[in-house]
Swiss-Prot record:
Protein name in the entry: Mambaquaretin-4
Domain notes from UniProt: Exploits its two major loops and engages more positions in its interaction with V2R. The pharmacophore defined by numerous amino acids positioned in loop 1 (9 to 18) and loop 2 (34, 39 and 44) may be at the origin of the absolute selectivity of this protein for V2R.
Species of origin: Dendroaspis viridis
Main location: secreted
Gene Ontology CC: extracellular space
One Pfam family it belongs to: Kunitz_BPTI
Length: 57
């Protein structure tokens, strides 16, 4: 799996409300979170399917 999958979930400092998904190394699953719309990191996906394809081993 790519190293960015292991980054902590980071909603970012902006105040938008965008549905997104991140991979949790602890559970080896993808979970939903609310993305603020700016910054954040590479552990952010538009769909749970994309998250699973990329990060779940």
């Amino acid at each position: 799996r790519p190293s960015f999958c292991n980054l902590p979930v980071k909603p970012g400092p902006c105040s938008g409300f965008f549905s997104a998904f991140y991979y949790s190394q602890k559970t080896n699953k993808c979970h939903s979170f609310t993305y603020g719309g700016c910054r954040g990191n590479g552990n952010r996906f538009r769909t749970i399917e994309e998250c699973r394809r990329t990060c779940v081993g």
